[in-house]
Regions:
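A detector for short metal-coordination/catalytic motifs
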Residues: 99, 103, 121-124, 132-194
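DNA-recognition alpha helix
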Residues: 1-6
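Major-groove recognition helix of helix-turn-helix-like DNA-binding domains
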Residues: 7-22
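A short, conserved structural fragment
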Residues: 21-25, 164-165
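Charged, alpha-helical interface segments at or near domain boundaries
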Residues: 45-96, 101
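Short Lys/Arg-enriched helix C-cap and helix-to-coil transition segments
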Residues: 24-44
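The −1 position to Zn-ligating cysteines in a subset of zinc-ribbon hairpins
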Residues: 8, 115, 128, 151
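Short, charged surface segments at domain edges that flank catalytic/cofactor-binding sites
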Residues: 77-118, 133-146
Length: 194
């Protein structure tokens, strides 16, 4: 990022430390920013700290600008099925949703080392950035990477359909419907190991 914006890595790190001084979660752990540096960051913090969807898209918009392109050009393949007839606010909203979902996926997969949390499968085309709290149930957590888990397509579908879930200690729990299949070859192969 430092190279992209023409700064040194140290100056970027210092700016991030200023944001740390505004973060209540970091403050509760005793992390402090630089004296006086936080005021330069406060307006951005206030604008985006409770709106991760806007933050992600604005970051991508700014990054595209530094790369001398637009968000729509940068994500052309992802957006190719949006009809040209869709314009204005409707198009902008759909573009933002698609771009944010892509960024969310990139962050979640990176957080898990591009491996399924349950099986270790490391083929990106088979990996899904699943939402722990479903996307439709909590707008505040939609784009929060802490609300994401990297699963292979099989385990994502099982999680989405309520066949598996996770305890507070991160242990896999099987639904009674899935447990009816204990003893079957596929259960032994795909579910016993997790």
């Amino acid at each position: 990022m430092a190279n992209l914006i023409g700064r040194t890595p140290s100056s970027v790190a210092m700016r991030l430390v200023n944001y740390a001084s505004l973060d209540p979660m970091l403050q509760s752990r005793g992390v402090q920013g630089l004296a006086g540096g936080a005021e330069k960051c406060r307006s951005y913090w206030d604008e985006f700290s409770n709106n991760q969807e806007a933050l992600l898209f604005e970051c991508e918009r700014i990054r595209a600008s530094y790369e001398q392109t637009s968000v729509e050009n940068k994500y052309r393949d992802l957006l190719k099925d949006i009809p040209d007839s869709l314009v204005g606010e409707s198009r902008a909203s759909l573009v933002q949703i698609r771009v944010n979902q892509s960024v969310f996926r990139q962050i979640v997969l990176a957080n898990y080392g591009y491996k399924c949390a349950l099986s270790g499968i490391d083929i990106p085309d088979l990996l899904v950035a699943s939402h722990v709290i479903p996307w439709s149930e909590n707008a505040q957590e939609r784009m929060n990477p802490k609300n994401g888990i990297c699963l292979s397509s099989l385990y994502d579908k099982a999680f989405d359909k309520g066949l598996i879930s996770f305890s507070d200690q991160y242990h896999v729990m099987f639904s009674s419907r899935l447990k009816e299949n204990v003893g079957k070859d596929y259960f032994a192969q795909y579910f016993d190991p997790i």
